Amino acid sequence: MRTPASISSHPIHPMLITIPVGLLIFSLICDLIALFSAEPDVWLLVAFFTMVGGFIGALIAAIPGVIDLLSIDDAKIKKIGFTHMALNLIAVTLYAVNIWLRVEGTSTGTPLILSVVAVALLGVSGWLGAEMVHKYGVGVDTSTAK
């Protein structure tokens, strides 16, 4: 099942999403390190900038993801795709709030809680994205298989 958002038969969304997801997970790791660090401000700053980078990257990666989603005809796969997208939209919204709280100087545990919830949502969403590819062949161009 080929996708319209591709370069030389390679889907763009899976190429782009790895970096933002890695940055967002690393942001949570930095927050956790800050809890036990003698220099928590350094780790919180790294967490902030990796979160901002992950947030921007996720928005960019969403563009080819939506293009691919809209091209799916199978209702069952499309439902999985919309669930995948909804979870990602919730996670991105949590990160937007998280970034705003950090800019405003919120020092409570709320940003950490938001990060934990958002990473959990990304895990479930990633599972669904992988299911679409590995179980249903979304983005797999079988016409060029040898």
Name the predicted role of every residue range.
Residues M1-K146:
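Polytopic transmembrane helical bundles with strong interfacial aromatic enrichment
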